[in-house]
C-alpha cells in the first residue's frame, strides 16, 4: 500500500494529538513550576524578568496550588506580590494540572484591565502557556476579554464581581477573588461574593477557593470575615539573628517595648527591637530562609505549605482551610526607612493613617466612634488675620452647598501641609432656580481676596453640590465659569472612598461630575480640628478661623461640628455612619467640598502648595503680584488645558 508523505505527516499529527491527552508531566509543586516557568511581563511588573519565589511567598503559593487545601485566604499589605502569586498559581493550574479556573475582581473594569495588563502578557511570556494558545494576538472565539480557552481543553475566566449573573453557569475547579474587601457585601441581594462564587467549584474533584485582599474597616471587611471563618491564622515567624528566638514582625507603637523603633524625626535610624531579649535588629540582618508560618490559634506550622506540623512537631495532614497574613516589613521591595517615612506622613490625617494601617500593615482599620467636637470651644479659637488672606495661604478653593431657598458658600485658603484658613462665608438667599439668585452666586465665585502686600487672589477651584436640586443648573454654571474651575459634585457616603474621584472624561451633559467621599473627608476634617497650633508656627493640617463675626461665629462652629459617627444596622449589617441628628451642617458640607476642590487640584494638576507659596512670597510689588496670581489661578484651574 502506497502512502504519501502528506498522509504520513497527517497520521503522525493525529497520533501525537491523541497521545498528548494521555501524557502527564512529572508532578511539581506550584513553587517549583513557577520558578521554572513563570515570567513577569514588563506591562505589569516593576522589573521584567523570570520569577523567583521569595521565602514568605513559598508557603502561600504552595498552599494555593495544593489539592488538599480547599480554602486559602491571604490578608496582606501592598507590595508583597499577591496578584503575581495568584496569577503564577493560575498559570500552574492551567498548564500543569489542567484545571478550569475563574477569577473575580471587584468590577468589570478591574477584570478587563487585569486581563489586558496581567493575563495576556503572561500568556505571551510563558512558552508552555503560549503553546496552548494558538489564538494569541488574534480575534478568535477562544480569546476574549472575559475568557481564554486553551488547546488542552481548559478555560480561564476573568469577571467583574458586581453582577450576580457573573456568578452563574460556570463550572470550574479553581475560584479566586482579588481584592475581596472591595467587593459589594451583598451581590444584588443574592448573597456574599464568596458564597456565590464557591458554588462554581462544588462539582470539582479538587475544589479550590483562593481569596486575597488588603483589608479595610474592621467589622465590615469581607477578607476579615473570610479569615475569621478559617480555623487557622498563620503569621510569618523569623528568628532573631542575635538571640535566635522566633517572632513575627510587628510595627508596634510608643507604648509597646518591641517592634520598629527610631529616633524622632529620623527615619533612617529605624531598627527592630526583639520582643524576647530587646536585641537591636537591622533590616539587612534578618534571614528568612528557615522562617516559618505559625498559626496563632492552634500552633500548627509550615515552612513550605506542603509539609504541615502540629505545635509539638508531629507531621499532620494539611488543613482544609487556612489564612495567611503578610505585610510590608517582610518585603524586599521596600525598606523599613520608607515604612517609617510613610507613617510620619500620616500625622494629623486620619485618612492617611487608615491607608497606612490597611496598605502597609495589612490590618483592618478600627473606626473610632467618639463625641462631637465642642462647638463653644471651637468658637473661641478665633485669630486675627493680618489680611483677608493670611501670609501662609497659597491657594483658594470654595465649596457651594445647594438648598431650595439659598446657596451657601465657604472659601478656604490652603498652605503647605494642607494647613487651612476660613476666608469667607457667603449665603445667597433666593430660589435656587432663579437667574437673579444665580447671578449673585456668580459674583461670589468671581470675588477676589487681598493679601497683605495688596495682591489679589481669586478662587482657583470650586466644588458645587448637585444634590437636592436640578443638577443641570450646576452643569450650566460649570460651563459658564470653566469646566475645570467649577466642578459639579455628588456625595458618596462610602467609608474609605477617596475625598475626590474626578473622572477623566465628561459625562453626557458635558461636565466632569465628580464623586466626593464625604465620610473620608469628614473624618479627616474632624481629626484636624484637634490640632492646636502654637502661636503663629506652621502646623500641617491645622484649621484656622478669623476673628470676624461676619465669617465665623458660634453658629458657624455649631455647623462645622454638627455631625457625629454612629453605629447603625443597614441591610442586616452593622455600619458606622455620619449623622447630623437633624442639626444644620452646611458649613461642614462646604468645608468637605472645598477640601475636595483642593484634592482635585493636587491629583489632577499636581498642585504643590509649598512651591506655590514660595513663588508668591518672592513676588514684589502689587502690580506684578496681581498679574502673576492671575496667571497662577488660570493655570491651576485648568483653563489652559
From Swiss-Prot:
Changing residue 180 to F: Lethal, 91% defective in cos cleavage; 99% loss of DNA packaging, incomplete packaging. It is an enzyme of class 3 (hydrolase). One of its GO terms (cellular component) is host cell cytoplasm. Changing residue 46 to A/E: Complete loss of high affinity ATPase activity and packaging; no significant effect on endonuclease or strand separation activities. Changing residue 179 to A/Q: Lethal; very weak ATP hydrolysis and complete loss of packaging. Residues 588-616 are annotated as: Leucine zipper. Changing residue 166 to Y: Lethal, 95% defective in cos cleavage; almost complete loss of DNA packaging. It holds the Pfam family GpA_nuclease. Changing residue 225 to H: Lethal, 78% defective in cos cleavage; 84% loss of DNA packaging. Changing residue 18 to E: Lethal, 97% defective in cos cleavage; 84% loss of DNA packaging. Residues 166-349, 166-353 are annotated as: DNA packaging/ATPase. Belongs to the lambdavirus large terminase family. This is Terminase, large subunit. The gene is A.
